[in-house]
Amino acid sequence: SSFAKQIAMIEAGLQKPVLKVGNLDSLRTWSDVRDAVNAYYMLVTIDPIPGEYYNIGGSFSCSVRDMLDHLLSLSKVQGIKIEVETERLRPIDADLQVPDTTKFKNHTGWKPEIGFEKTMQDLLDYWRQRINSNKNFLSR
């Protein structure tokens, strides 16, 4: 969300065309929050089993760099520079972790519905709308 927010602020002229980033080589498994909320809803409404545990998450994995490249390809501004800030680097970064959602899928029939590309487009559009609806938007 930080990258999408920064891109939207650059597009609105509220930030110089420099994107502040951390480690772009980390691998992440991505899931749309709308899919996660749907999973949580199903968890409590479809035959919940007290004390049972489930993994919920996405199955699409890529590097943070690939995710950023995708967001930049959606930007209305070309030539945005990337600047690594040491305070954004984690002292220890986990290797790729992909949740095994088999048990939850078998119990509920749930599966992620919203693809990575749509998630990234919607995320950038959200920040564009939020920033453009209030030019006095405070960067936090």
Task: Show where each model-derived region lies.
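Glycine/proline-rich active-site loop of Rossmann-fold NAD(P)-dependent oxidoreductases
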Residues: S1-K5, A12-P17, V33-R34, M42-Y54, ...
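Amphipathic terminal alpha-helices
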Residues: F116-R140
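C-terminal "lid/loop" region of Rossmann-like NAD(P)-dependent oxidoreductases
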Residues: V18-L19, E52-Y54, C62-D69, V77-L96, ...
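Substrate-binding strand-loop-helix patch
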Residues: S1, G22-V37, E52-S73, L89-I92, ...
